[in-house]
Amino acid sequence: MVYRKPPDGGWGWVIVIVSFFTQFLCYGSPLAVGVLYLEWLDAFGEGKGKTAWVGSLANGIGLLASPVCSICVSSFGARPVAIFSGFMVAGGLMMSSFAPNIYFLYLSYGIVVGLGCGLLYNATVTITCQYFDKRRGLALGLISTGSSVGLFIYAALQRELIELYGLDGCLLIVGALSLNILACGSLMRPLESSDSPSPEKACTDKVPDQYFVYHEKEKTVEENISILEKGYIDEKCANNVPDYKQDNILNKNVLSSINVDEKDTYKKKVVEQTNFCKQLAKRKWQLYLNYWEETVVLFKNRVFSALFFAILLFDIGGFPPSLLMEDIARSANINEEDYHMPLVSIIGIMTAIGKLILGILADFKWVNTLYLYVLTLLMMGAALLAIPFARSYFTLAVLSGILGFLTGNWSIFPYVTTKTVGIEKLTHAYGILMFFAGLGNSLGPPIVGWFYDWTQEYDTAFYFSGFCVLLGGFLLLLAALPCWNACTDRSSKLPPNTYSYKVASSA
């Protein structure tokens, strides 16, 4: 479908508002799952690594399934997908209140809620991009803060609901709140299509009829013969021809000749259609090969390969604090009276601020977004290494704010990817990177939890997390150094026989 020119306003601002609240409602509980994590530890008595899988699946599976989610939005539209996904998120949260064990939560909270969030994310981004062109960056920045504000509010809300109604009541109420996604989704009116024919229809109109296996008006050979035979006999009976036997023989001869001709024509069409199917399959296979060739070309890019490792290591090491910070405070024996605000809420509000400030910095011409992203990775690695030394609420609150602000580097990640591979390859490269970002989100919290189960302390776990993020930052920094490009340019400009020529001349 061909959409008319994006209005950059009008109903588009309604789309921004409902997309903001959609991300607020769907991501609020999964991002603030650290509050629920403590209750699940007490309720089921499982290890921290096994319990952490619930939150990591809810936040990671949406990224892992992002290609499938994109196909669903492209096929059915943003509004139907948003409404359906609203039922998924609400149903998954409500089902989780009846969970008899941790494995049930893997399905209800981890997979169902996680997939619903992934579908909603793609729906909100797609419909926003359809309505905005010149102001697309501003619109996407506004809707992306919905998840961060949701993290800030839901952390305190879920804690209060648990104290009033228990864990099961909290999940039921949060699930009921998520039903408001249906109202938001119903307002995602698709952009009106233009009157001009779509490119797909224009292309298919030019294809000859013989290339369609089943033409609308085409009948089989047997049907054609039966129609001809019936029409010929009716005509002879109407004219009262006496020589029925002779005409019957003539009729059979005519029909046999028609039968042979139509069979030959049918065979030719079958051959043509078979060749067309072979060509179509060959073309699809060629597209598949081209995709993998382009993927290989992407990984030959030194900076892209480093960015691939950086985003994977960043999510393995940088995501666990938002899930485990509350348990870290409890393990440090910090009194609940000292809690002025949940640590997860601090992470959430600072993430929203970080997204806005880093996004503004990325728009300045004198700022290199790649080096800015590297700086956030190195600073986050240092902050993670400092967590084992924090023994008070104030220190953990400061570190939570720093980590939340630096996590806002998600807002500049598309800029970094574009700068690395170019706008032509952005979709392909960004899809690969998001898949492995989801893998890191899924693996990070369980790994940190297993470290705690092994050592009975979080110190080793966060030394590991800090090392992962620092390693990713240093790899990206080394790959992005301009000296590599200078060496490459110098070697490409040198003639192949320069060295032997100099030796011969000196001799």
Swiss-Prot record:
Entry GO MF terms: carnitine transmembrane transporter activity; creatine transmembrane transporter activity; monocarboxylic acid transmembrane transporter activity
Record localization: Cell membrane
Keywords attached to this entry: Cell membrane, Membrane, Transmembrane, Transmembrane helix
Function as written in the Swiss-Prot or TrEMBL entry: Extracellular pH-and Na(+)-sensitive low-affinity creatine transporter. Also functions as a pH-independent carnitine efflux transporter.
Gene that specifies this protein: SLC16A9
Family (UniProt): Belongs to the major facilitator superfamily. Monocarboxylate porter (TC 2.A.1.13) family.
Keyword Membrane: yes
GO cellular component: plasma membrane
Side Extracellular, residues: 1-12, 74-79, 124-136, 185-302, 362-369, 417-430, 482-507
InterPro entries recorded: MCT9, MFS, MFS_dom, MFS_trans_sf, Proton-linked_MCT
CDD domains, per database record: MFS_MCT9 (cd17428)
Name of the protein described by the UniProt record: Monocarboxylate transporter 9
Transmembrane segments: 13-33, 53-73, 80-100, 103-123, 137-157, 164-184, 303-323, 341-361, 370-390, 396-416, 431-451, 461-481
Membrane topology: Multi-pass membrane protein
BP-aspect Gene Ontology terms: carboxylic acid transmembrane transport; carnitine transmembrane transport; creatine transmembrane transport
Entry annotated with the keyword Transmembrane: yes
Reaction equation(s) it catalyzes: creatine(in) = creatine(out); (R)-carnitine(in) = (R)-carnitine(out)
SUPFAM superfamilies linked: MFS general substrate transporter
Cytoplasmic side: 34-52, 101-102, 158-163, 324-340, 391-395, 452-460
